[in-house]
Amino acid sequence: METTPLNSQKQLSACEDGEDCQENGVLQKVVPTPGDKVESGQISNGYSAVPSPGAGDDTRHSIPATTTTLVAELHQGERETWGKKVDFLLSVIGYAVDLGNVWRFPYICYQNGGGAFLLPYTIMAIFGGIPLFYMELALGQYHRNGCISIWRKICPIFKGIGYAICIIAFYIASYYNTIMAWALYYLISSFTDQLPWTSCKNSWNTGNCTNYFSEDNITWTLHSTSPAEEFYTRHVLQIHRSKGLQDLGGISWQLALCIMLIFTVIYFSIWKGVKTSGKVVWVTATFPYIILSVLLVRGATLPGAWRGVLFYLKPNWQKLLETGVWIDAAAQIFFSLGPGFGVLLAFASYNKFNNNCYQDALVTSVVNCMTSFVSGFVIFTVLGYMAEMRNEDVSEVAKDAGPSLLFITYAEAIANMPASTFFAIIFFLMLITLGLDSTFAGLEGVITAVLDEFPHVWAKRRERFVLAVVITCFFGSLVTLTFGGAYVVKLLEEYATGPAVLTVALIEAVAVSWFYGITQFCRDVKEMLGFSPGWFWRICWVAISPLFLLFIICSFLMSPPQLRLFQYNYPYWSIILGYCIGTSSFICIPTYIAYRLIITPGTFKERIIKSITPETPTEIPCGDIRLNAV
């Protein structure tokens, strides 16, 4: 193994053509003048010393194929890096492990065959999710840019991908933080001797409110509702004051104050960059695991817990013959790991050049999947307890999905446990920290992208730009804080972001593997890590992962989800609205392709060639090294 240090300082004027020189701590390569002879078929991105097929032999400077040419741009200042390696790992884990791990995976698992679902889930993770995760970490670490400007170094015509990612991130921030606002409202309401969703004697309760756990004789009817359900729907959401999407009603000032507090925490956590957010995640990324452990032990000691675990894991192998099970497995692993959102590119761009991103991808992916699996035990031990207390089947208790599973079913179970106040406080605090990590990451992806794309405008004004982003997201969230805001949240989650980010990720995978070239990409990885990705990874990146994404997209388009929330059926026009919102993001990709071809001079063929040829090389900070296999 040969290593090349980048520590020496040389004047560019003292270098001959083709030599590697240092200026201001950044390695540069002197480019020959147009009159000089060069390799006519040389790859123009500057990363490789191996000429393209058909390259001429008449060259002034020949470079051995076993040597790596070190090339870099002259940049102002050095790029910020993580304070410690563990800061990066905790940030990535905190981003990947979010609210969906707690509510979505357990529900999907038991609905799709219980323990049998783990087979398609694992297969989809190995062949689809993890390869895409690894690809984004490697791209970000090598090119050291956000999701917009990185395409100048990969395939400029696809720069619209970066803009699409930023728009999607705004849509996600508009509804995701609202769910945290609900959790914060629950947290504040939990500081009482008796949790307010325990009884039916509150001002918001109706005559249909029936307490399962009351000592009085009760009769449960089809119209009966639990105290927890009425607290969630009539007090927190106040959804009864809205007639649907056509009449959302006013804004809940309580939720507006909650989300304002959340955005304040977000701002002061990310305003200074990854060195500050990297310290915050020491709390926000580790705290959920402490609470999950406490809740798991508590749930396991409850009567009837075994019924919930059996219901969760009992395999139904016949389910594997259904296409829907494999679709759910693919979608769950993709949205859980989170490639395609620009976050992994941003986080990895702050790594040291020789950081082992391959190992990071495997470790964080395994931690994420295991967290989802363990969260199922946390949820279903409590559901088993509720089924035992109600003398019902677990299937009757576990009918709620999505946020309702947390804010109604689990909240009701906690309210009827010993020390209910304590467990309610730590549970909703856990939900908030899970959400904060993902929000930190999502906004950092946008901030890094814009700062890298417009460094002369925003590089020294990061705090102001972060404030502008946070304020924009706050105002974008107002529509989800209305009395009918829950309808908007579900619409945005199902239609506005899901299909869009899948499409963006598919185009990104194709652009890297097919246009930039899998050989070139693997050569980049080898320069960083000293070894080249094996054939398994190459096949996944070129064929399996794109097919994996195409499979999910086609399945969604062929059988789109029928939206229903509580007793409200979404009108047909709302589905069209959802598709339009989703299209508004990834429409940036074909729009930029057309724009690029129009502004590029030359014939149409020349425009195509110039537009898919990398424009700029990658800077290697002084002090880093590239590893070259000899």
From Swiss-Prot:
Tissue expression summary: Expressed in platelets (at protein level).
Modification type Phosphotyrosine: residues: Y47, Y142
Transferase listed as a keyword: no
A GO-annotated cellular component: endomembrane system
Residue sites binding serotonin per the record: D98, T439, E494, Y495, F556, S559
Biological process annotations from GO: amino acid transport; behavioral response to cocaine; brain morphogenesis; cellular response to cGMP; cellular response to retinoic acid; circadian rhythm; conditioned place preference; enteric nervous system development
Phenotype for I425V: Linked with susceptibility to obsessive-compulsive disorder; increased serotonin transport capacity
Annotated InterPro entries: Na/ntran_symport, Na/ntran_symport_serotonin_N, SNS_sf
Region (Interaction with RAB4A): 616-624
Keyword annotations: Antiport, Cell junction, Cell membrane, Cell projection, Disulfide bond, Endosome, Glycoprotein, Membrane, Metal-binding, Neurotransmitter transport, Phosphoprotein, Sodium, Synapse, Transmembrane, Transmembrane helix, Transport
Modified residues (Phosphothreonine): T276
Quaternary context: Monomer or homooligomer. Interacts with TGFB1I1. Interacts with SEC23A, SEC24C and PATJ. Interacts with NOS1; the interaction may diminish the cell surface localization of SERT in the brain and, correspondingly, reduce serotonin reuptake. Interacts with filamentous actin and STX1A. Interacts (via the N-terminus) with STX1A (via the H3 domain); this interaction regulates SLC4A6 channel conductance. Interacts (via C-terminus) with SCAMP2; the interaction is direct and retains transporter molecules intracellularly. Interacts with ITGAV:ITGB3.
Protein's recorded name: Sodium-dependent serotonin transporter
Species of the source: Homo sapiens (Human)
